[in-house]
């Protein structure tokens, strides 16, 4: 059976977040089981144009890249038209990473036109707040969704969601009968070992991600400044993508008295070192509700837990069950609740923290294995399972 993969960006593309990372993890998991695919994507990366031999999508897979230009964030390039049409025509089934970008739109339309089986991973594209924002403020984009995106999605054999919130958003737009495959993203953990506890006094936290409102870091910093102790430290690592928001972030840095350090973008090896030097990863996405944006999953949470790092996360993502799983603390989307979670973290004994660390790593091994989760998606994509469209409740729902 010939399987095609369409993505806007693929690893090691720099600057495009978790979608490219997730595409690589899933395809490599399939390759480890002997499943071979053909990948079509743009050559876009903010540091250079990718070449097929650079792409990290698994051994034995064919990679076809087209030239991206103009609207490079959306993977625009006229070469996508023949490349994606050819892929859809020659494939028995196609897996599409994302919605509303140039290659993803083409793939959905071509699959529908050719009568091909296809699955679409939303990657946050229909999160409730995101849809509400488009409807209210972006009439041209909303028209694009109505005319092109939604009709194609309704022809998919399954919509791949990673959390209950993402599932609710998809069904709100596409209808209650929309066939949902709810399976979380996996994380590659086998080459990693849980790191020992950080040395030195104080509580050490880290935030990994873009400095933007969707991530909620400024709201979290305001909470942090209210409760931090003299020896506590917070490190922020990630690019700035919003000048106004970044100015506010810099003002908060100045108020921190050196307790907050900004390191900018870090390569993967340095990210892992930062996690190892921290007691907790923080993911406050959605804490600043103005603008209504938040993440659908949060791959960085899984990556942190793979290194034995418990987490502090805002509720409403894929991680509301971290306390039940004893892998961290969850807080409501308010600064007051974030302060409460921070105080709980500050009060932990070394033994209590070590238990959270152990359970975080164990959770990843049991629930977020990319090969096992990838097989669930593969079976639906290839019609090898009796898929009914009822969500498969996996680790993302923590129940």
Predicted ranges, named:
Residues 165, 186:
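Carbohydrate-associated surface elements
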Residues 301-306, 310-314:
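Short hydrophobic beta-strand element within catalytic cores of glycosyltransferases
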Residues 246-272:
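Nucleotide-activated donor-binding/catalytic signature segment of Leloir-type glycosyltransferases, i.e.
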Residues 160, 198-215, 221-226, 235-237, ...:
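Conserved donor-binding/catalytic core segment of Leloir-type glycosyltransferases
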Residues 45-46, 187, 208, 233-248, ...:
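Glycosyltransferase donor-sugar binding loop
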Residues 324-336, 344-350:
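Conserved acidic donor-binding segment of nucleotide-sugar-dependent glycosyltransferases
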Residues 85, 109, 113, 126, ...:
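Membrane-proximal helix-turn-helix segments that form the acceptor-binding/catalytic region
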Residues 157, 276-296, 309:
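Acidic donor-binding loop of glycosyltransferase active sites
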């Amino acid at each position: 059976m010939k399987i095609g993969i369409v993505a806007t960006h693929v690893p090691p593309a720099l600057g495009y977040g978790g979608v490219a990372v997730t595409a690589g993890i899933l395809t490599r998991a399939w390759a480890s089981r002997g499943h071979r695919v053909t990948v079509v994507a743009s050559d876009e990366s903010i540091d250079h144009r990718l070449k097929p031999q650079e792409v990290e999508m698994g051994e034995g897979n064919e990679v076809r890249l087209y030239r991206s230009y103009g609207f490079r964030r959306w993977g625009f390039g006229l070469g996508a038209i023949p490349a994606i049409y050819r892929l859809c025509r020659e494939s028995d089934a196609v897996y599409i990473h994302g919605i509303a970008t140039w290659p993803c739109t083409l793939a959905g339309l071509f699959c529908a036109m050719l009568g091909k089986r296809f699955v679409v991973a939303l990657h946050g594209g229909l999160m409730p707040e995101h849809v509400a924002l488009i409807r209210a403020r972006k009439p041209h984009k909303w028209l694009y969704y109505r005319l092109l995106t939604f009709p194609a999605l309704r022809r998919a054999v399954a919509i791949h969601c990673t959390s209950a919130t993402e599932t609710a958003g998809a069904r709100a737009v596409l209808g209650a009968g929309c066939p949902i495959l709810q399976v979380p993203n996996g994380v590659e953990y086998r080459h990693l070992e849980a790191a020992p506890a950080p040395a030195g006094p104080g509580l050490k936290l880290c935030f990994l991600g873009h400095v933007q409102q969707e991530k909620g870091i400024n709201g979290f910093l305001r909470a942090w400044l209210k409760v931090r102790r003299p020896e506590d430290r917070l490190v922020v690592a990630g690019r700035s993508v919003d000048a106004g928001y970044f100015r506010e972030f810099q003002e908060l840095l100045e108020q921190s008295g050196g307790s907050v350090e900004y390191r900018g973008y870090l390569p993967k090896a340095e990210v892992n070192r930062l996690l190892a030097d921290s007691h907790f990863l923080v993911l406050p996405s959605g804490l600043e509700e103005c603008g209504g944006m938040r993440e659908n999953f949060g791959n960085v949470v899984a990556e942190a837990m793979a290194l034995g790092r418990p987490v502090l996360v805002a509720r409403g993502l894929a991680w509301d069950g971290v306390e039940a799983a004893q892998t961290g603390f969850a807080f409501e989307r308010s600064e007051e609740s974030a302060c409460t979670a921070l105080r709980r973290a500050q009060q932990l004994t070394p033994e209590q923290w070590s238990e959270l660390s152990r359970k975080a790593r164990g959770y990843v091994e049991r629930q977020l294995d990319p090969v096992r989760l990838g097989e669930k998606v593969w079976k639906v994509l290839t019609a090898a399972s009796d898929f009914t469209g009822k969500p498969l409740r996996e680790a993302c729902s923590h129940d």
